[in-house]
């Protein structure tokens, strides 16, 4: 009962802070205070989704830059910035370039793990979808701070020894329903198999969630991977300590209140795979913290992966919505 009450109080206080960000009384409440990062953090990553940059809406560019400025001020080193898709609103080249340039100028993380979303591929109207994917690759290669080069919009990378695999819509005539070629399935399987013997958690970043996880079927019936879902899940379930990070359905960060009322959570473990669904950074969310600016600070330790809820726009922590996932 107290946990549910804290959830409600946290929502009210956080809403007031968006209106009165400099209130000393509100900022002093224990419910939003930051617990110090524990000793022994092996990987520290900021994870967000659905940024929806549009050069015709400059306030959105400012909101993105403001959140990255919060990361830049972090007293703890941020090893990676992870964005799980919908980097832009309409997939136009100018907005994609703006998204990347804002990150490049912020110097907020040593590594980037960036996935394309349906708004970056499926919603492209002024050029072929493959051209949009190649422009994404070129910007990543030219600007990412680690200097790493990728050949395709789906790729793998290692950060502090941890394997990350990024997936993408391979289709040429898709909108909101992604398509994946056989080559990409094989790439996912091989990339996880290659790193599995390290005994470390592995992370798969894909904009669209697999079917039926994190409340996708209740929130947006057609908002999952569709025909690709079973194949992707069958690969994920072959390996231990896999974390699947998605966005797309604009679900707010939530906790016991939503889980008890609706039967799902933004962090779930199903058949041994850990599924994390992120809110939209730029737009209103449902079934959880509703406003934008939200994401997780993901801290990896020897025995757990800790997801600490944070509003990067208002520089506030939401400890009542933290999730700890044990490493098996």
Language model feature labels by segment:
Residues 1-24:
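Gram-positive cell-envelope targeting signals
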Residues 23-96:
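N-terminal active-site segment of His-dependent metallophosphoesterases
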Residues 29-31, 36-39, 289, 293-328:
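A short C-terminal boundary segment appended to hydrolase-like catalytic domains
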Residues 47-49, 81-86, 112-118, 204-206, ...:
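Active-site neighborhood of phospho(di)ester-bond hydrolases with catalytic His/Asp-centered motifs
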Residues 51-54, 87-90, 118-123, 170-174, ...:
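Solvent-exposed loop/turn segments at secondary-structure junctions
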Residues 56-60, 124-132, 214-225, 256:
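Short, flexible/disordered intra-domain loops and linkers
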Residues 93-196, 231, 237-238, 254-283, ...:
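Extended active-site neighborhood of metal-dependent phosphoesterases/phosphodiesterases
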Residues 174-179, 195-246, 254-260:
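Active-site-proximal segments of metal-dependent phosphoesterases and phosphodiesterases across multiple
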